[in-house]
């Protein structure tokens, strides 16, 4: 339904409801940018590291700033009762991973030469679980969560990744890394 409003160059009702003075952005590559394994992509400073992601949507303010938008859906409840999603504190781990995802998308678009807004949004659809019968239909409460992004951290992380990939030393595993524990356990079993 968001694309319908994009074609009409009109605000989606959720934008009006939350006071976002923007419309859907159109770019001739948007359909490619939205595809998994295609996405919007940029090479990082001649390193052969390509950073990409499939953006869900882009909006645009009147001043030309592009707004990154991502869609999430879940069915969140507390004590088996429906729980409204009102801000990032209601999202898994305070939405930290979603905020980082939005900021990486902002950075990619910035590196591609776009005028990118610090504002970014999650359109968060939360399915009601307390219905007696679903009848093959899920009803959702849809909330718009705003995040003021800061992608200044992205290049530092990419530099660290590049250095690690070009190093002859293997870093120590971390107790905070689930995959590290799995690999360590597998190595003990099979080596």
State where each predicted segment sits.
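Mg2+/Mn2+-dependent nuclease catalytic core
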Residues: 33-156
């Amino acid at each position: 339904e968001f694309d319908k409003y994009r074609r009409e160059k009109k605000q989606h009702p959720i934008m009006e409801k939350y006071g976002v003075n923007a419309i859907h952005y159109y770019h001739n590559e948007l359909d490619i940018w939205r595809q998994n394994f295609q996405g919007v992509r940029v090479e990082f400073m001649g390193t052969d590291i390509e950073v990409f992601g499939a953006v869900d949507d882009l909006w645009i303010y009147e001043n030309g700033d592009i707004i990154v938008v991502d869609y999430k859906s879940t069915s969140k409840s507390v004590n088996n009762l429906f729980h409204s999603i009102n801000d990032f504190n209601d999202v898994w781990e305070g939405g930290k991973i979603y905020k980082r995802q939005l900021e990486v998308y902002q950075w990619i678009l910035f590196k591609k030469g776009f005028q990118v807004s610090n504002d970014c949004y999650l359109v968060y659809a939360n399915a009601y679980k307390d219905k007696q019968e679903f009848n093959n239909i899920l009803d959702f409460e849809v909330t718009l969560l705003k995040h003021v992004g800061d992608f200044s951290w992205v290049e530092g992380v990419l530099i660290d990744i590049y250095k690690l990939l070009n190093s002859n030393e293997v870093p120590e595993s971390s107790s905070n890394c689930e995959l590290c524990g799995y690999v360590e356990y597998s190595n003990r079993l099979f080596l």
